[in-house]
């Protein structure tokens, strides 16, 4: 690894109201960049890795320093351009333009492979931004907890008469994304057994209360699961082992979980999935000396992993891919029926996307947890009738450990995002919270991603691979005045399999911010309703009509009906 990708330095975002940059609109991206690299947030901050294999916040440390310098100097009518983690230009725009525009990991489709990307990365010409790593809005595992919780809850509704009490989920992976699974299962009322091959990750999840217990052996783990499910307790258990070994063993023993999924970093076979029989140090060494052989070894293990998942599915166990592209990797290794079990979006989440409901998140730039608790109360006040959401907020306050700057996520839709943003802006204006708040989201949202093996799998009209939609989302958020906008490739499922966009907007208490919030927090989720209405989903068409969206072709179709 080039020296510029490693630095023994601890980075934490400033707290309070003293500015390092010239305004809150440039202070916000500066703090959020730094927050992504906080050791309480990032998986490997010394190498700029935030989460998801090699998802970085900046291309190298020289680029990081240059980004920080540019943001501290940026004027109110200038825009900083970031190309794969490198600051490449500052241009005069206008006050309501984004302060930062980011493009990460984008490759011409024919060359959009891990092999070509890794060559560029080795030359210092590219950076893998994942989704929220390179777009500076990662908030730790909380960022995916509610989405995973909603998935488990819906699985309980569909398969177990609305409750997961006395049930258990089998999964793997305790990294930045997978680490949400055990807590989400617990919050949904289920026990869980999560396989993780790195003890350090288990230790972190135990320390932050995302995992309740660690078992010493597989027999110990199964004994715990049996005891807790019999007692109706929702307890999460971790086991340090390789999923490619454990899942086939469970199949051979005839063990029958109640849900099976996976959230290892299978999207990146070179850095994110330990081959069976290897130790982590051997994996890292071989990734440098023999990348092709290492990737093949990882994918062979993924094939064994997926064959076991298929066996569980054949037993009648609800089994689903949680968006890491492990089915694709297995299919490339000869598992022709790898896609016989579905992804989580078509199985459980798409009805939410049809109404523009997705991962709305916000961060208190003050660093004061009380600011988040006050906004929690405001959400309950505004979305007064949604008791399911209230329950989520109560559980989140009780169980979720803040990582870095205090943050919250809750899944809300087109009807509410603008209202909540305006309310937060008013709280800043009136001094109810001590500093501005940033509002963003995961790129995993209803209108901001094209990913045929994940968010857009099995679209009704067959438009799974059409990536015009995230491009339009990024363009519209730019035109609407988001504070920073990002357009990435390869997040979640790896090179060649996704394109996606993100946005963040600052609530600084000004009238100008309120005007931008009205545009951005309406238009952004509205693109999701538009995308699903265009694909023929009745729920989305109904939502578009209810919210008064101007969708010419949908209106024409409705008129013909």
UniProtKB/Swiss-Prot annotation:
GO terms for biological process: L-histidine catabolic process to glutamate and formamide; L-histidine catabolic process to glutamate and formate. Gene3D superfamilies: Urocanase like domains, Urocanase superfamily. It holds the Pfam family Urocanase_C. Binds 1 NAD(+) per subunit. One of its GO terms (molecular function) is urocanate hydratase activity. The active site is at 410. It is an enzyme of class 4 (lyase). It comes from the Bacteria. Its EC number is 4.2.1.49. Pathway: Amino-acid degradation; L-histidine degradation into L-glutamate; N-formimidoyl-L-glutamate from L-histidine: step 2/3. The keyword Zinc does not apply. Keywords: Cytoplasm, Histidine metabolism, Lyase, NAD. GO terms for cellular component: cytoplasm. It is found in: Cytoplasm. PROSITE patterns: UROCANASE. The keyword Cytoplasm applies. Belongs to the urocanase family. HAMAP family: HutU (MF_00577). This is Urocanate hydratase.
